Each structure stands twice: as structure tokens, then as C-alpha cells.
């Protein structure tokens, strides 16, 4: 059923949080949930009854972590390990454990370490717990979001300024995309869910709640801000028209609605970095996923938590998969405010020159008009996957790696 109180509250919270952080100005958002929610409520109740048997089967498959682990190939493993440079006795935090590919690689490089494995996905947490049985002295599994990480780390006995390395591997994992009932992929039909936390928070809105409740202006704002979709108004209008006839509850149902807003020739007109055709609804799915999971706010909070818990000289490695994530990471590492409107590359040059001219002044926090620099970049330019890596793992084609040392 549609979660009215929570949905209204989280909708307002998202707005206030975005305006406060200044990362993106989404403009004026609606304050009321549409009356279509009532019709959706009744429809969803019947849908849940019809789908119970199928979902139980999927859940049992989801618990088979051995199978799920094989579905995810970690991206840029060698580069991640080199940037983290694990040494004997050090302590690390993998903030996006997933199926543990990067964690295993780090342990293979240096087994005599302690590694805290954090993930918001209960399936990933189950895999981390299973792996901790094989590495009882090394791995500590933690279930939670980036925004909960500080409290969870303190509870686990980790003090600020003590970690030697932190890894963030953002976006969806293959095991999430390839599990239809999670509702992340437009290629496999399933309930329109998209919650990375799974069923941990029953009142948390799903993607179906979003597309069936928000008005056209709000939907267009989400598509524009989180999907960078230039046809946001057209797609939002198509969603409004379709849900007036029937509630939108399935992934391929939403994909078909988006496709129907364009001529057939446009369905796969867009190309990815490998020049392969991509579905016209890809950006729409990205936008709703980011909104449902509050991903960009979570990322910014995660970066601040990493900075707080890393020791001076500790390494931060962040893998992103779209420009919104990379932009936040880049600005954070360069000390550029999220509200900065100057061209980023030009602004970067100003900061670098300022660092050379008055390095000591910045360190002491003397009035310079800028925050003291907190990071030294390991690489001057962002790292991307090698051609061979992309051939082996096409899903990692858009990966960007940024690494820095805390000053």
C-alpha cells in the first residue's frame, strides 16, 4: 500500500536537504500527494496477492549468495588495490561491499588487515557475513546506509581519524540489476521497486509510489536533475497520461510508457560509450533510482564520513558511474563548494594556483575566501577502465576512479 505519511515527509526532506546542500536546485516541488494514490492503493493490493508466490521464489533465489556473488564482476580491481596500497596491520572500510569483489582483492594483496564491510543492501550484508566466517579476524560486516555509517562505525569501536583506507564503489551492482523482483532493470520485468535497502524500511517509497503519486512538474524535475534527461517534460507527461488509465507497477510497463512517448526510430537511437544502442528509458530508470534511494545526498554524507574517519595520510578511493556522482566527488576532493557556479575546470585551476601561492596560509585556515585543502590527489586526471577490462565487463564501461590522500 502507498505510504502516505512517510512519503509526504521524505518528499519534503529531500527538498530541504537539496536546497541546504546546494548540490542542485530542483525548483518548487509539490506539497500534496495526488489522488491517483487511492486507485493505486487498491490495484497494488490485488497485485501483491497475485505476485506472492513468485516473489517468495525470487527471495529464496536471492538468499543464495553463492550464486549472486558470481553475477557481479568488480570494476577496476587492480587500480583500486594499487590506490589503497594495503599494508600489514592496517584498517580499511569498504562502504559499498556489494558481493565483495574488491574486498577479496584487497585481502588477497594483504591478508593481515582489518576490513569493515558496509552495505545498505541486506543481500550484500548476508554475503559479507558469510565471507566473515571465512575471514573471522579480518572482516566485520555492517548493515547500513552512508548516512548511518558514522554511528555504526562508532558502535563497532572505530574511532575518527583511525582508518588507513576507504573505498566507495557507487551505483547498482550486477546482482541488483539481474534480480527482477528488485525492480532496477528495464530489461527484466518485475515490480517497480528500486529500493537498495530492500524491505528493511517498509514505509520507504518505491519507484512505483513515486511515478503514481507525484505531479508532472515534480516528475519532470526528478528526470531532469537525476537523469539529465533532456526530454523530461515529454516523459513526465506520458507517465501522467498512462497512470490516469491504470497504475504503473512494473518495470517493463514504465519502460513501454517512456518508449511510447517517442517514435519507434528513437527507441534505441542513443548509444553508450561502446557505441551500443541503449533503451530510451535508461535515464528515466536512473533518475527514479537515484531519487528513491536519495543517492546523491547519501554520497555527499559518505564522503564527509570517510574524511572524518580517515587518518592523515589515509587513502580514499571512489568509483562512480555517471556524471552526477563524479561531479560531487571531484568538487569534494578539490574543496569546491557544491553551490559553486563557476566552470569547474577553471575553478580547479584557481584552487591549484592558490595552493601553490599560499599553501601554508591554507593549512592554517587564515582568511583566504576558501576552505583549507584537505586532500592530495593521487592522480592528476580521473582513471577509466582499460579497453580489455571493458570487453570483459561491459557494465563497467562508464566507471571513473578518483583517489586522494587525506592531508
From Swiss-Prot:
Entry function: N4-methylcytidine (m4C) methyltransferase responsible for the methylation of position C839 in mitochondrial 12S rRNA. Involved in the stabilization of 12S rRNA folding, therefore facilitating the assembly of the mitochondrial small ribosomal subunits.
Protein name listed in UniProt: 12S rRNA N(4)-cytidine methyltransferase METTL15
Primary subcellular site in the record, as a coarse category: mitochondrion
Keyword Transferase: yes
UniProt keyword annotations, A-Z: Methyltransferase, Mitochondrion, Phosphoprotein, S-adenosyl-L-methionine, Transferase, Transit peptide
Modified sites of kind Phosphoserine: 358
Stated family: Belongs to the methyltransferase superfamily. RsmH family.
NCBIfam families: 16S rRNA (cytosine(1402)-N(4))-methyltransferase RsmH
Chain positions recorded as S-adenosyl-L-methionine binding sites: 100-102, 119, 146, 169, 176
Keyword Transcription regulation attached: no
UniProt-annotated location(s): Mitochondrion matrix
Gene3D superfamilies registered for this protein in UniProt: Putative methyltransferase TM0872, insert domain, Vaccinia Virus protein VP39
Xref: SUPFAM superfamilies: Putative methyltransferase TM0872, insert domain, S-adenosyl-L-methionine-dependent methyltransferases
Amino acid at each position: 500500500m502507498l505510504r502516505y505519511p512517510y512519503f509526504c515527509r521524505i518528499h519534503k526532506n529531500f527538498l530541504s536537504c537539496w536546497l541546504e546542500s546546494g548540490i542542485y536546485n530542483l525548483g518548487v516541488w509539490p506539497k500534496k500527494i495526488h489522488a491517483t494514490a487511492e486507485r493505486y492503493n487498491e490495484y497494488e493490493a490485488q497485485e501483491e496477492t497475485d505476485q506472492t508466490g513468485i516473489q517468495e521464489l525470487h527471495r529464496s533465489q536471492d538468499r543464495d549468495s553463492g550464486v549472486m556473488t558470481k553475477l557481479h564482476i568488480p570494476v577496476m580491481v587492480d587500480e583500486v588495490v594499487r590506490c589503497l596500497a594495503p599494508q600489514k596491520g592496517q584498517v580499511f572500510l569498504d562502504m559499498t561491499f556489494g558481493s565483495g569483489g574488491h574486498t577479496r582483492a584487497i585481502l588477497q594483496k594483504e591478508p593481515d588487515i582489518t576490513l569493515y564491510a558496509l552495505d545498505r543492501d541486506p543481500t550484500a550484508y548476508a554475503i559479507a557475513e558469510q565471507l566473515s566466517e571465512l575471514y573471522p579476524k579480518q572482516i566485520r560486516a555492517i548493515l547500513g546506509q552512508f548516512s548511518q555509517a558514522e554511528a555504526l562505525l562508532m558502535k563497532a569501536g572505530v574511532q575518527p581519524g583511525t582508518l588507513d583506507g576507504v573505498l566507495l564503489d557507487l551505483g547498482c551492482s550486477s546482482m541488483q540489476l539481474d534480480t527482477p523482483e528488485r525492480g532496477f532493470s528495464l530489461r527484466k520485468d518485475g515490480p517497480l521497486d528500486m529500493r537498495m535497502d530492500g524491505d528493511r524500511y517498509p514505509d520507504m517509497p518505491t519507484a512505483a509510489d513515486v511515478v503514481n503519486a507525484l505531479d508532472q512538474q515534480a516528475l519532470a524535475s526528478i528526470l531532469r536533475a537525476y537523469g539529465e534527461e533532456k526530454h523530461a517534460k515529454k516523459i513526465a507527461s506520458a507517465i501522467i497520461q498512462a497512470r490516469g488509465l491504470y497504475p504503473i507497477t512494473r518495470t517493463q510497463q514504465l519502460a513501454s510508457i517512456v518508449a511510447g512517448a517517442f517514435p519507434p526510430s528513437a527507441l534505441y537511437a542513443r548509444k553508450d560509450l561502446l557505441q551500443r544502442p541503449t533503451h530510451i528509458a535508461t535515464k528515466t530508470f536512473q533518475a527514479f533510482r537515484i531519487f528513491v534511494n536519495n543517492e546523491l545526498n547519501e554520497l555527499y554524507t559518505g564522503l564527509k564520513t570517510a574524511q572524518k574517519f580517515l587518518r592523515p595520510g589515509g587513502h580514499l578511493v571512489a568509483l562512480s558511474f555517471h556524471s552526477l556522482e563524479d561531479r560531487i566527488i571531484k568538487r569534494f576532493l578539490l574543496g569546491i563548494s557544491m553551490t559553486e557556479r563557476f566552470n569547474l575546470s577553471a575553478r580547479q585551476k584557481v584552487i591549484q594556483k592558490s595552493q601553490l601561492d599560499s599553501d601554508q596560509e591554507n593549512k592554517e585556515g587564515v582568511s583566504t575566501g576558501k576552505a583549507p585543502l584537505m586532500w592530495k590527489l593521487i592522480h592528476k586526471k580521473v582513471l577509466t577502465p582499460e579497453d580489455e577490462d571493458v570487453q570483459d565487463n561491459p557494465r563497467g564501461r562508464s566507471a571513473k576512479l578518483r583517489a586522494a590522500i587525506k592531508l
